[in-house]
Amino acid sequence: LIVNILYINLYKPKYPHNNDSSHQMYTEVFNGEYHIRVGKNQQDNDNIVRTSPQSALWFHLKDFPSAHAVVTNIVKPGKYDNAVIIRASTLVKDSAKQGVNNLQKVSVNYLPIKNVRRTEILGQVFLRKAPKTIHI
């Protein structure tokens, strides 16, 4: 029995990808310049982090579980104004589970996705730098 468990753990893929889940992901074009993607589950969150360009911004609620959101400037990569940061933060807040919607303000962390690394746990990430925080 122990041998079978070890076999399963050793040969289980670290990142099981299912490209069919992209239809569940929320996408939006904001002001004709920004592409916003918000995950609806762990697979979407992993796909967002894995497939986003290094110039994109990544968003997540501080201290609460939530969807990941990524904003890409399709006109001027790497340039982001406050309006799109507020919009993406609001989408992340709206995606949160119970407990967060009862709060008047929540904190949303964001930073360039080049400082976000995936972990072996699907949908979880490691931040290489301290994020900026906005209160929504």
Q: What are the roles of these predicted feature ranges?
A:
Residues 2-136:
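Duplex nucleic acid-engaging cores and interfaces of nucleic-acid transaction enzymes
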